């Protein structure tokens, strides 16, 4: 499994709200494929509903001190994350791969399950400890 880590830096135009910058970045092209907007349209027709936090972002925004510090934000892409549905005993785990016309379905399945394995082990350990 190859993992991508990127640091993206830039300067926001004053007329663009900080939240608009974050909204434009998610879901990232590394999760959707390219061209991003068309791919998101296709995903919306194929998947039964929204992905929730999976492929979204978790992070923070700071406003700065208004003089020298401009503020900023730092977000990560949510992958291999377990989401617990309160009171139900259900846990949801998103995992995926980059499927292309040349993909091998068995290989993609194996990659997806490999990516999910560590989180599944943690869930099982919690279940056994309960």
PLM-predicted stretches and their roles:
Residues 1-130:
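Conserved hydrophobic core element of enzyme catalytic domains
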């Amino acid at each position: 499994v190859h993992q991508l880590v990127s640091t993206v830096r830039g300067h926001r135009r004053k007329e663009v709200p900080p939240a608009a910058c974050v909204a434009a970045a998610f879901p990232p092209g590394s999760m959707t494929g390219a061209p991003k907007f068309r791919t998101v349209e296709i995903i919306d027709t194929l998947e039964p509903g929204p992905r929730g936090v999976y492929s979204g972002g978790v992070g923070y925004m700071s406003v700065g001190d208004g003089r020298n510090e401009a503020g900023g934000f730092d977000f990560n892409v949510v992958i291999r994350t377990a989401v617990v549905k309160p009171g139900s005993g259900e846990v949801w785990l998103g995992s995926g791969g980059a499927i292309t016309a040349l993909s091998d379905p068995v290989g993609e399945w194996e990659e997806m399950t490999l990516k999910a394995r560590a989180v599944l082990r943690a869930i099982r350990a919690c279940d056994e400890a309960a």
